[in-house]
Swiss-Prot record:
One of its GO terms (molecular function) is nicotinate-nucleotide-dimethylbenzimidazole phosphoribosyltransferase activity. Keywords: Cobalamin biosynthesis, Glycosyltransferase, Transferase. It is an enzyme of class 2 (transferase). This is Nicotinate-nucleotide--dimethylbenzimidazole phosphoribosyltransferase. Gene3D superfamilies: 1.10.1610.10, 3.40.50.10210. Its EC number is 2.4.2.21. It comes from the Bacteria. It catalyses: 5,6-dimethylbenzimidazole + nicotinate beta-D-ribonucleotide = alpha-ribazole 5'-phosphate + nicotinate + H(+). The active site is at residue 313. It comes from Parabacteroides distasonis (strain ATCC 8503 / DSM 20701 / CIP 104284 / JCM 5825 / NCTC 11152). Catalyzes the synthesis of alpha-ribazole-5'-phosphate from nicotinate mononucleotide (NAMN) and 5,6-dimethylbenzimidazole (DMB). GO terms for biological process: cobalamin biosynthetic process. Belongs to the CobT family. Pathway: Nucleoside biosynthesis; alpha-ribazole biosynthesis; alpha-ribazole from 5,6-dimethylbenzimidazole: step 1/2.
Length: 346
């Protein structure tokens, strides 16, 4: 299987970074989370003057066999319809990407549709038709999981080679909140009932049905419970690609902007495999999907925004980017007390 070499950022520069932040013209700590972000980014980049370059939002897309059990309000064909909307620039994340200067990369990891050759669509289809139905069998084979991890990592390598040092991950795949709930309950031991939500808009009866399907799936699972086995048995190709992408981004010392419930569960899996990767993560928002706050708490993560979002696509992480930008501008553009000839007042 693909291996990554991920080290936590060297903290040798921490004192100098903190001193620079503390000596900007403000009361110590008065810019709160911006100061913590500036310190984190400075450590990731190992510099007193960090920069953000060429932000990219990568959207991995695939269909899920479990969707055949009616665990989503939307039918499978919505996945490919939304892909077309991405390509036409009309989706929610598209206007946010335009607003905040992100390049969008759309990756077909296993959508149940034969797209024609489209220059803007990156074809990395692991299996035609998407994953298998994990109510009855593993969603993917070991070989397919390894291929998805590699494909996800390769996309990030391309972004890095194009000058990107801050990357957001989004997803599209009907049924992927169900898959994420399975990852969450298996790897956190949080009861399944607390991991299952409305997804794309199920009513209470729909959520109950979704829970019952997932409960049966959990009862049928006979694996070893390891992160790799749980990822393979219940995951979507787009989710496994995101895990591979996140791990490669951490290996390359890029800043990882984490989106919603699904991407946070991808961090859960990735950090179980390589705990140091979480040092590179900035959690964009706490969404409205049941379980999101619980998995953030499990990871010890504090999200930047709480706007009731549950769209996915990377929309929440792209929304949070200006806060990260403000933190970097703070450490680079604010004057020190000495520069401003102001008496240090703390």
């Amino acid at each position: 299987m693909i291996q990554f070499h991920i080290e936590a950022p060297d903290k040798g520069l921490e004192a100098a970074l903190q001193d620079k932040i503390d000596n900007l013209t403000k009361p110590k700590g008065s810019l709160g989370t911006l100061e913590a972000l500036a310190l984190q980014v400075g450590l990731i980049q190992q510099t007193l003057s960090p920069v953000l370059r060429h932000p990219v939002n990568v959207i991995y897309a695939s269909d899920h066999g479990i969707a055949d059990e009616g665990v989503s309000k939307s039918p499978k064909e919505v996945t490919r319809q939304v892909i077309h909307n991405f390509l036409n620039g009309g989706a929610g994340v598209c206007y946010l990407a335009r607003q905040h200067g992100f390049e969008l990369k759309i990756v077909d990891g296993g959508v149940d549709f034969d797209f024609p050759v489209i220059p803007q669509l990156i074809d990395r289809k692991v299996r035609k038709g998407g994953t298998r139905n994990f109510l009855h069998e593993a969603a993917m084979t070991v070989e397919e999981m390894e291929k998805a991890l590699q494909y996800g990592a390769d996309i990030v390598t391309d972004c890095y080679n194009e000058g990107c040092n801050v990357i957001s991950f989004g997803e599209m795949g009907i049924g992927n909140t169900a898959a994420s709930s399975m990852w969450m309950t298996c790897l956190t031991q949080i009861p399944l009932i607390d991991c299952v939500g409305a997804g794309s808009g199920l009513d209470s009866e729909g959520v109950r049905h979704k829970y019952n399907v997932l409960k049966r799936s959990l009862e049928n699972y006979k694996g070893d419970g390891s992160a790799l086995d749980v990822m393979r048995y219940f995951g979507g190709y787009e989710m496994v690609m995101a895990v591979g992408g996140m791990l490669r981004a951490a290996e390359l010392k890029m800043i990882i902007l984490v989106d919603g419930f699904i991407m946070t569960n991808c961090v859960l899996v990735a950090s179980r495999l390589y705990p140091e990767m979480q040092s590179y993560c900035v959690f964009g928002h706490c969404g409205d999907e049941a379980g999101h706050k619980r998995v953030l708490d499990f990871l010890g993560a504090k999200a930047l925004l709480d706007l009731g979002l549950r769209l996915g696509e990377g929309s929440g992480s792209v929304c949070a980017y200006p806060i990260l930008d403000s933190a970097v501008r703070m450490i680079n553009e604010m004057h020190s007390f000495k520069q401003a000839a102001i008496t240090k007042y703390f």
